Amino acid sequence: MTASRIESIREGARKNFSRGYNCAECVLQAVLEHVETGLPRESLRMATGFGGGVGLFGDTCGAISGAVLAVGAVYGRSELPQDEDRKAAMQAAARQLYGRPGLYRIFNQIPNRMKEKYGHTLCREITSQWQDQWLCRDHALHCREIISDAAELAATLIFAEQEKISSEPFGANVENLKDLPAQCDAKG
């Protein structure tokens, strides 16, 4: 059952690209069509600016950004942990993100796995051979494959057991974190 839902999301993203959605929109729309998130259809608007690595800037691949938005639609926070003690509330919020389990461990897998497959996470690098022919067919086919892979990855993470995937080790990250920073630990 789950495998067929993942495949439906992958194929939905491919079809979305053929219909004219940009890379980020393709991934998010495919997930919104197949997963109950409670978000209105208008939520897709948030993805538009991420196309072409943020408005054709060439930064983080729009398909990767779309996958992050899609996974966030399911696992993202809608409220912060509450505690009358401000320090305890901050520590609880940090544990929710950095801890084991922690939400950043889920999101961190997206760019790391895509980089493993494509060698980069930047749109301008992943599509470098088409910089002078942005609208050519080969470029579109390449991006469609990236979009499909990003949608499949997002769906795989969404349908995985949350406790397990939120306890995975961090991949590459800005602080080379492996575990919760000591300053975020309630004891630290």
Give, region by region, the residue ranges found by the protein language model.
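Polybasic, low-complexity association/targeting segments
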Residues: 1-19
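Acidic-glycine-rich active-site phosphate/pyrophosphate-binding loop
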Residues: 1-4, 28-49, 120-127
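Glycine/charged-rich beta-loop-alpha catalytic/anionic-binding loops adjacent to active sites
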Residues: 5-11, 45-53, 131-132
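Short, contiguous, pocket-lining structural segments
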Residues: 19-23, 59, 142, 146
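Glycine/serine-rich anion-binding loops at beta->alpha junctions
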Residues: 21, 50-70
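Amphipathic alpha-helical interface segments
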Residues: 29-34, 68-71, 84-181
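C-terminal catalytic subdomain
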Residues: 65, 75-82
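Long, low-complexity, intrinsically disordered segments
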Residues: 182-188
